[in-house]
Amino acid sequence: MTFTAPLQKDAIRIMLLGSGELGKEVAIEAQRLGIEVIAVDKYENAPAHLVANRSYAIDMQDKSAVLELIEKEQPSYILPEVEAISISALFEAEKRGFHVIPNAEAVNKTMNRKNIRVFAAETLDLKTSGYEFVTTLDGLKAAGERIGFPCVIKPVMSSSGHGQSIAKTANDIERSWEIAKEARGDASELIVEEFVPFDYEITLLTVRNETGTTFCEPIGHVQKDGDFILSWQPMQMSPEALKKAQEIAKAVTDGLGGRGIFGVEFFVKDEEVYFSELSPRPHDTGMVTLITQSQSEFALHVRAVLGLPLDFTFYGAGACGAYKAKNESHNPVLEIPDDAFTKDSFVRVFGKPESHVGRRMAVSLVLDEVKEAKRRATEIVETIDDH
């Protein structure tokens, strides 16, 4: 591959649409290769803004604003990092010859739970939980009765667990409706899912490039209110279940096409593997790879996009704990004990300009056998404070 100098007319440019903590790590990996980075988000001083060559704060759901910026910057690759983006702008950008990663149609299918569920279950005939889509409270009540209780209720468009809830009985339906409607994102339509009494859930990081499809070690995770609080790698699972997960992940990512990393989520019950969701980009649970792999999910994503060789050397088991702010602040300060930083552990601070209760501000990372790594990652998170 030929590497040009950044800030020159012939520079290789990556535009990040979404500049949170995941985008920040992608930007850092691109910078290590001398790639020019343009970071875009809806607010100033987002994490990836701090490590980019140029940054912008725009309404990413405004088609005209997105296209105007793309034409101005002329990126070699456009990397959507969040769901709240004008999909029509991405389709138009492709028509104009710009390269969207993995492609605009894949982003369209995966940014919307309805699109990806219908694609997986009905087009690809993959095993999923039962589901219905509703747009009214009466429709939600009826769907709950048909699906059965408990059931999981989510907006078709939201991220990081926003708007998700479990209705244990019919009496919970109105509360779930209100939770969904108060979430950020588009809550005009909801998905009602059968609750699968799973043994565990995993993320299978799946990487596509010109040479084929490769998988990282499976990642186990625990979620609270739909957002991860702890992840670890590897997740111990039977060879049969892992093979099924890999086959499903390959089928769905082959169906989407393009290159880069995909975070494919599954529920596992006994030996049954249920497809859940998919993100066509690095996954929050995959931050554990910052300490467990020779090339993190972010490095793999950038290298796959550029067509560079990939390395999947696994250093050893590890865990990642999410620290969420306890306070509101326009100038957040994190207090982290020194013993969080050792030869086998560290904390990544995202540098977000504001905090609010429940906002993810940092992660702890520990390299150790799984049980001890999970304990230590959780312990470190519990010792952090903010003000």
From Swiss-Prot:
Swiss-Prot/TrEMBL catalytic activity: N(1)-(5-phospho-beta-D-ribosyl)glycinamide + formate + ATP = N(2)-formyl-N(1)-(5-phospho-beta-D-ribosyl)glycinamide + ADP + phosphate + H(+)
Enzyme class (EC, first level): ligase
Entry's Gene Ontology BP terms: 'de novo' IMP biosynthetic process
Residues annotated as binding Mg(2+): 265, 277
Domain ATP-grasp: 118-306
EC number, as in UniProt: 6.3.1.21
An example Gene Ontology molecular-function term: magnesium ion binding
Record bears the keyword Coiled coil: no
NCBIfam families: PRK09288.1, purT
Function noted in UniProt: Involved in the de novo purine biosynthesis. Catalyzes the transfer of formate to 5-phospho-ribosyl-glycinamide (GAR), producing 5-phospho-ribosyl-N-formylglycinamide (FGAR). Formate is provided by PurU via hydrolysis of 10-formyl-tetrahydrofolate.
Family: Belongs to the PurK/PurT family.
Protein name: Formate-dependent phosphoribosylglycinamide formyltransferase
Gene expressing this chain: purT
